[in-house]
Amino acid sequence: MTDEIKKENAPKKLSIQRRTKTTVSGTSTTGKSKEVQVEVRKKRTVTTDLERKAQEQAKLKAKEEAEKRAAEEKLAEKAKREAEKAKAEQIKVEKAKAEQAKASKKNVDVEKEKRRAEEAELRRKADEVARQKAEEKAQKAAEEAKRYADFDDSDNDNGKLDDYSDYHLTSSYALEAENEEERRNENRGRSKNKVVKAKKGGRDDENGNKNERQSDRRNQKDVKGKGKHAKKASALQQAFTKPAQVAKADVVIGETITVAELAAKMAVKATEIIKTMMKMGEMVTINQVIDQDTAQLVAEEMGHKVILRKENELEEMVMEDRDVNAEKVHRAPVVTIMGHVDHGKTSLLDYIRKAKVAAGEAGGITQHIGAYHVETNDGKMITFLDTPGHAAFTSMRARGAKATDIVVLVVAADDGVMPQTIEAIQHAKAANAPLVVAVNKIDKPEANPDRVEQELLQHEVISEKFGGDVQFVPVSAKKGLGIDDLLEAILLQSEVLELTAVKDGMASGVVIESYLDKGRGPVATILVQSGTLNRGDIVLCGFEYGRVRAMRDENGKDIQSAGPSIPVEVLGLSGVPAAGDEATVVRDEKKAREVALYRQGKFREVKLARQQKAKLENMFSNMAEGDVAELNVIVKADVQGSVEAIVQALHELSTAEVKVKVVGSGVGGITETDATLAAASNAIMVGFNVRADATARRVIENENIDLRYYSIIYELLNEIKAAMSGMLQPEFKQEIIGLAEVRDVFRHPKFGAIAGCMVTEGLVKRNNPIRVLRDNVVIFEGELESLRRFKDDVSEVRSGMECGIGVKNYNDVKVGDQIEVFEVVEVKRAI
């Protein structure tokens, strides 16, 4: 074994190198002798005897392999003949059995089954024998081919230099054997026997053999696979059909969307949408918010299918998740007291409640909505809402009318119908609320109830006396006359209306009033309209939400629940809701918070859209108007209703020249933040029934801010008007103070034409502007250059005196002209 290894490792080639050094003498270009050393190298490669013997042995083995292959073919042919012979014998047996089956009619079915089984068994055995023989032969051929191929590969590298003919001969034998084996494997459809080349030689040979084996496996798999994994013929051709039109996806549009967002959803440029809307007659910018209908028209115009999405799906789901099929019961009427200033609304309600609250109200005006419920003598209940009587509280009175069932219109018998009385009638009609007229102050000597009925006829308030359906009840809030009759009239009207509500279930109502209490936080007065509001319920109220921590009635008493038509003060909301917001009890606090946040975001979006629209629409008009003076005001009041009413009244004071800008408003006392805002915006601070804390007062003093306190709205509006009047641009009026008639004209080398005049009216002053009149037409307007009486320069000349007048830059004075002297007077303006 060791000798064989030594033989294998013995060198197969022998290289002989020979070096010869020689010195050559020569003459350089300069004539000097020069010696040059020359080295001659010779190399000769001699092939060893071992290599020649290996080549001869390979030839012999290749010849033997060919002979063996011929013998194997003979054996295969012999096996084939044997199989055919067996098949012929099988056919004979089948024929014999068939004849036997024909002869025997009784056992036909049994014989058929037996024959089929025997046929299958014979066929299986024949196939098994043939398959085994073929596999054995193929295995032997593969092993022989593998051995010679490996030997051939190793000899190819060694015999390239000396004998090319032997190389081609040896390689052809191995290649032919390999190809023959591949053909057999392909014919049998088998992929188990793979032709693998030996790992011999360097790394390049290993990589090459590995690639060849992978290629062989892929080729055999391609031939065999004909099922779903069969590899198709690669034509290296790909086809791409260009779509006939652009694929347009569905566009989901919410209630509002910006132009940029719509362009992104439609996968087009925003300029395309702007062009489309310009064709439709709309001018928009890329960041402008458009409504759902406009976005739908634009998208459909550009060929997209639109899917409209309701953004308030969660809100609707929360609102609809309520108790159903609850039984309705009769409820107490909600009555709103309306009327003119000082006609006795609060005094009337005060007498009904048997509590003195009207005396403390400033100026006799109810400053914010109060809600009370009382019981009549027969045990029935009535809820009263008291709205302010001043015209500035229009929004509050309208809000009270929306929450009410019956309106009691209080009219003083001695005063008659007044402007606020007419407004109250209009609000009642807008709310479709029936009227009951209470003619107050009938105890006064000058009272005339019939005149009140006559005046109300002009406003379509027809009493039952004249064939109408409005009840007129004469009362006296001071002496208590007719109060029971008024309550009976209210109950009678409520029976006609058949007022009902769900008593058991989740409550809903409306916010009558709200304010921020320093100790208790946000406080909201809620009128329950249906269901029962319990302590601990989760209430969603406009932009705010919260759990009811405490409930109090109008007397400040803690209560646990409140049914329909009961007003209560609720604590526990996240913020101060707006008066008039709908209050609803919901099941889930988390969903209530989500709805409240959604409403806040929606309000901001709508507000932004309005601002952008106003900017676009008023851009050119604002440029034409120029600068408009603005009076910045910060309003703080005790309740939300007063804040809204004051802000509305201030906006109505705005004129074309001076505008009132409310930079901040809120409920509660004046804080340091309010004072800082006023200093930054140069605003007037207005406190209505509130005061500034110590920190705010310190900022106000340091910044010299104008802070004013009020308890009556008349005084507030009058002082704001005065401040606005001071901001108006003053008017200038020209007053003629003197008139002089030209009697003669003199020439002066220094002053030019000098007019000798007689002062006919008023007074002529040197420094005042003048006009030159000719035939009562102004021909020049300028100023006097000199004024002399005789030789003396004077400052003024009175009527009836003569004087010399030199007009500056004007020498065309003629006899008969009139010189009119005037002065410009500033006239203060007022709103």
UniProtKB/Swiss-Prot annotation:
Composition bias (Low complexity) maps to 22-31
The Swiss-Prot or TrEMBL record annotates one GO molecular function as:
guanosine tetraphosphate binding
According to the record, the residues making up region (G2) are 364-368
Q: Where in the cell is it found?
A: Cytoplasm
- Composition bias of kind Basic residues appears in 190-200
Residues covered by region (G1): 339-346
Q: For bias kind Basic and acidic residues, which ranges apply?
A: 1-11, 49-150, 157-166, 201-225
Q: Which CDD domains does this entry report, sorted A to Z?
A: IF2_eIF5B (cd01887), IF2_mtIF2_II (cd03702), mtIF2_IVc (cd03692)
Q: Which UniProt keywords apply?
A: Cytoplasm, GTP-binding, Initiation factor, Nucleotide-binding, Protein biosynthesis
Question: By its UniProt entry, which InterPro entries does this protein fall under?
Answer: EF-G-like_DII (IPR053905), EFTu-like_2 (IPR004161), IF2_assoc_dom_bac (IPR013575), IF2_II (IPR044145), IF2_N (IPR006847), P-loop_NTPase (IPR027417), Small_GTP-bd (IPR005225), T_Tr_GTP-bd_dom (IPR000795)
Could you tell me the superkingdom of the organism this chain comes from? Bacteria
Q: Where is this region: G3?
A: 386-389
Q: What is its main location?
A: cytoplasm
Q: Where does GTP bind?
A: 339-346, 386-390, 440-443
The annotated region (Disordered) lies at 1-236
User: Which parts of the sequence are annotated with region: G4?
Assistant: 440-443
Q: Which segments carry the region annotation G5?
A: 476-478
What function does the entry list? One of the essential components for the initiation of protein synthesis. Protects formylmethionyl-tRNA from spontaneous hydrolysis and promotes its binding to the 30S ribosomal subunits. Also involved in the hydrolysis of GTP during the formation of the 70S ribosomal complex.
Q: Which family does it belong to?
A: Belongs to the TRAFAC class translation factor GTPase superfamily. Classic translation factor GTPase family. IF-2 subfamily.
PANTHER family recorded for this chain?
Answer: TR-TYPE G DOMAIN-CONTAINING PROTEIN, TRANSLATION INITIATION FACTOR IF-2-RELATED
Q: Which NCBIfam families match?
A: IF-2, small_GTP
Name assigned to this protein: Translation initiation factor IF-2
